[in-house]
A protein has these predicted regions:
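Formylglycine-dependent sulfatase
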Residues: 1-220
Length: 220
């Protein structure tokens, strides 16, 4: 949204907002000999067009095409499908016998939706004013529709741990050489479902607990 005037809030299957021919800070660092990485919330799109992703193969163009040597990212945000990690442009833990399908136009037959099945929402209730009443993943309804990829789905309470672990490992692996690392946390972004060790600890509700979790990530 910040990079091009014709881009609003990107769907989870949007094409990449920053085109490969556009120079980036990551490109500049890489050209100067830095090892570059992008970890966490992405929401800049993947592939060359909306709906053009091969979710079950190598997704391109992607972070490697705009300057990043390594990437471990969400396709978009925590509240949009697909709810999976994408490492170096391939979905992590994907079972080829359970391929992923994604749509932002219509639901998949037989897949329950938050607006129709509130009894399946074991964590957060649907928020139809913002579109959070579609596909159900990890007991939370999302924006958009998806099916398959059950083995690859993230657990919201572990998102911060996943991002932090990957970021710390990247830093440790490259501490003796120049590196540039972009880390995008998802803590304050909906659905805000922090790890149990932070729940109720801030005294300021779920958002406060999520910010406490963010503080932990920065500290690590």
């Amino acid at each position: 949204a910040w990079r091009r005037n014709d881009t609003g809030i990107a769907a989870g299957n949007a094409g990449m907002v920053i085109r490969p021919e556009q120079p980036t800070v990551a490109d500049m660092f890489r050209e100067c000999g830095y090892t570059t990485g992008a970890i966490g919330k992405w929401h800049l799109g993947l592939s060359d067009r909306t709906g053009g992703q091969d979710w079950n193969g190598f997704i391109t163009p992607g972070p490697s095409d705009i300057g990043f040597d390594y990437s471990y990212i969400m396709a978009a945000t925590g509240d949009r499908v697909p709810c999976v990690w994408v490492e170096n442009q391939r979905i992590v833990n994907l079972d080829p016998n359970d391929p992923i399908e994604v749509s932002y136009e219509k639901p998949f037959p037989g897949e329950p939706l938050g607006k129709d099945h509130p009894e399946l929402l074991t964590k957060l209730k649907p928020s139809p004013n913002h579109g959070h009443d579609m596909a159900i993943v990890n007991g939370i309804s999302r924006i958009g529709y998806m099916k398959g990829g059950k083995q690859a789905l993230w657990e919201d309470e572990n998102i911060a741990d996943s991002i932090t672990c990957k970021a710390v490992r990247f830093i440790e692996n490259h501490k003796d050489e120049p590196f540039f690392l972009y880390v995008g946390t998802n803590d304050a972004h909906v659905p805000r479902w922090p790890h149990p060790r932070f729940v109720g600890k801030s005294g300021m509700g779920p958002r406060g607990d999520a910010l406490l979790q963010f503080d932990w990530t920065v500290g690590e």
